[in-house]
């Protein structure tokens, strides 16, 4: 069986590409829905996105242990998730924003797990996650 060099190169690139890829530029626009509750403020006080403080500051959320932003009072379930060693990835953020309650119930294996985030983002979670990752680079 003959495989062309082009086909082999394309296959290698597809296999090497990350399975998760959001668009940070689209995510920046989509984040307008999020700023109703969240802001993005750098440690030096620079307001990247001025938003409400109903939810935690999302600066540096990718890689952060869940439920640990010091200036926010989290619900018990998200604190328990963090206590288990869980740290946010872009993929997890994208899944979480689709259905925060279902995400916590699955991750904690607890049907009674509750979230403080009632909003569900049906589409664009990957883009928002990519945007959140990009603001700290």
UniProtKB/Swiss-Prot annotation:
InterPro entries: Cyt_c-like_dom, Cyt_c-like_dom_sf, Cyt_c_1A/1B. PROSITE patterns: CYTC. Residues 1-21 form the signal peptide. GO terms for biological process: photosynthesis. Heme c binds at residues 34, 37-38, 117. It comes from the Bacteria. Keywords: Electron transport, Heme, Iron, Metal-binding, Photosynthesis, Signal, Transport. One of its GO terms (molecular function) is heme binding. Binds 1 heme c group covalently per subunit. Belongs to the cytochrome c family. Cytochrome c2 is found mainly in purple, non-sulfur, photosynthetic bacteria where it functions as the electron donor to the oxidized bacteriochlorophyll in the photophosphorylation pathway. However, it may also have a role in the respiratory chain and is found in some non-photosynthetic bacteria. PANTHER family: CYTOCHROME C. This is Cytochrome c2. It comes from Rhodobacter capsulatus (strain ATCC BAA-309 / NBRC 16581 / SB1003).
């Amino acid at each position: 069986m003959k495989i062309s060099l082009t086909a082999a190169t394309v296959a290698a690139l597809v296999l090497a590409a990350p399975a998760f890829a959001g668009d940070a530029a689209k995510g920046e626009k989509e984040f307008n829905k999020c700023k109703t509750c969240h802001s993005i403020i750098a440690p030096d006080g620079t307001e990247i996105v001025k938003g409400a403080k109903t939810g935690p500051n999302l600066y540096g959320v990718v890689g952060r242990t869940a439920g640990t932003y010091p200036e926010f009072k989290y619900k018990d379930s998200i604190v328990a998730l963090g206590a288990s060693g869980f740290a946010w990835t872009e993929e997890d953020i994208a899944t979480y924003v689709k259905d925060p309650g279902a995400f916590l119930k699955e991750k904690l294996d607890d049907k009674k797990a509750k979230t403080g985030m009632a909003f569900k983002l049906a589409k664009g979670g990957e883009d928002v996650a990519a945007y959140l990752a990009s603001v700290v680079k």
